[in-house]
From Swiss-Prot:
Keywords: Cell inner membrane, Cell membrane, Membrane, Plasmid, Transmembrane, Transmembrane helix, Transport. It is found in: Cell inner membrane. This is Nopaline transport system permease protein NocQ. It comes from the Bacteria. Its main location: membrane. Residues 21-222 form the ABC transmembrane type-1 domain. Pfam families: BPD_transp_1 (PF00528). PROSITE patterns: ABC_TM1. SUPFAM superfamilies: MetI-like. Component of the nopaline active transport system probably consisting of four subunits: Q, M, P and T. This system is also capable of transporting octopine provided that catabolic functions are induced with nopaline. Belongs to the binding-protein-dependent transport system permease family. HisMQ subfamily. It is a multi-pass membrane protein. The chain crosses the membrane at residues 25-45, 63-83, 102-122, 199-219.
């Protein structure tokens, strides 16, 4: 293991690995943000009184959770390129190759996958809120939006935090899959460094350490958030 390969500047790959780590964090954060949005919308659909919305939510979670994330990435990447070419040809007569933006593809695919898992977490959290609290809010004249903001969301968020922490960990690790379509994050940088220097162990053990550090730091953050959310709550 040659640690000199990890130094900064032209003589090493330290700065490239740092940029790859930053890209991983950015992709994971964006994907998690949109995943929570997808999860909230589809959780609401699965809790709806309308069967069509419940069916839509069931189809989304079943399909996305039943298909490998890598396959979703390939389908969206190559299917997105085909769709863009079709639109460009129909509107402007352009017949050349159009490559969809890799960052957008990566965030879209990972957020769709994260959203499927977040859907079930949020749905379970909403169902865990004691019905008596909702009835009490109704009895004192709270409207639907006020009940949602003052009763349902704060309580459901407390129940959802542990599961959403797991969704974040999955999302962070899934960013490594985007390297197959060319996005330069940690794994892509490690692969390029390994191929260039013929020292694969050095770069992959470095990627291992970076992912472990990111995972550990974010895990501590979620534990602190859970502790804050449960302040004043009696332990059963």
């Amino acid at each position: 293991m040659d640690l000199t390969l990890l130094q900064w500047g032209d003589a090493g790959w330290g700065d490239e690995l740092a940029r790859g780590a930053m890209m991983t964090v950015v992709v994971a954060a964006c994907s998690y943000f949109f995943g929570i949005i997808f999860g909230s919308l589809f959780a609401a659909a699965k809790l709806s009184r309308f069967w069509s919305l419940r069916l839509l939510g069931d189809v989304y979670t079943t399909v996305v959770r039943g298909v490998p994330e890598l396959l979703i990435i390939f389908l969206v990447f190559f299917g997105g390129g085909t769709l863009l070419r079709t639109i460009a040809n129909g509107l402007f007569g352009y017949e050349g190759y159009i490559e969809p933006p890799i960052f957008v593809i990566g965030v879209l695919c990972i957020s769709v996958s994260a959203g499927a898992y977040a859907t079930e977490v949020i749905r379970a959290a909403v169902l865990a809120v004691p019905p008596g609290q909702i009835e009490a809010a109704k009895s004192i004249g709270m409207g639907p939006w006020l009940r949602l903001r003052r009763v349902l969301i704060p309580q459901a968020a407390r129940f959802a935090l542990p599961g959403l922490g797991n969704v974040w960990q999955f999302t962070l690790k899934d960013t490594s899959l985007i390297s197959v379509v060319g996005l330069v994050e940690i794994m892509r940088t490690a692969a390029m460094g390994a191929g260039s220097t013929k020292q694969p162990f050095t770069f992959y053990i470095t990627a291992f350490v970076i992912f472990l550090l990111l995972s550990s730091v974010s895990n501590r953050g979620f534990l602190k958030a859970e502790k804050w959310a449960n302040r004043g709550v009696r332990s059963q």
